Amino acid sequence: MIQPQTLLKVADNSGAKEIMCIRVLGGSKRKFGNISDVIVASVKSATPGGVVKKGEVVKAVIVRSAKGLRRADGSYIKFDENAAVIIKDDKQPRGTRIFGPVARELRDKEFNKILSLAPEVL
């Protein structure tokens, strides 16, 4: 469950290391986001020479959540950390590599490029 002020690890090589959620997109009363939801975030720490800089406001999609997610078959998927991938406006990732596993639920919202770059899809 991701809400404003939540810190997330960045799971790509766009240059950002950590981002903080500013807003969960998808309605004015939306308070929480889960896996495959798009958020607006601020870059809190970044590597030198990266594509994104510290303080930049970016869009990101949540790929891992410590809260977990219930699937249609009744099973749950849960990760050790909260992580996101920084995206462009056309749902394409800004980085060229994805680190760590991502959830299969990204396919429902058509983040196919992220799924193809990920080393493991759970």
From Swiss-Prot:
Under the heading Pfam families, the entry gives: Ribosomal_L14
Which is an annotated GO molecular function term of this record? large ribosomal subunit rRNA binding
The biological processes this protein is annotated with in GO are: translation
Which keywords are on file for this protein? Ribonucleoprotein, Ribosomal protein, RNA-binding, rRNA-binding
Cited InterPro entries:
Ribosomal_uL14 (IPR000218), Ribosomal_uL14_bac-type (IPR005745), Ribosomal_uL14_CS (IPR019972), Ribosomal_uL14_sf (IPR036853)
PROSITE patterns xref list: RIBOSOMAL_L14
Which Gene Ontology cellular component terms are annotated? cytosolic large ribosomal subunit
Instruction: Give the coiled coil ranges.
Output: none
Annotated function? Binds to 23S rRNA. Forms part of two intersubunit bridges in the 70S ribosome.
Question: What's this protein's family per the entry?
Answer: Belongs to the universal ribosomal protein uL14 family.
Q: How does it assemble?
A: Part of the 50S ribosomal subunit. Forms a cluster with proteins L3 and L19. In the 70S ribosome, L14 and L19 interact and together make contacts with the 16S rRNA in bridges B5 and B8.
Q: What's the protein name?
A: Large ribosomal subunit protein uL14
Organismal lineage: Bacteria, Bacillati, Bacillota, Clostridia, Eubacteriales
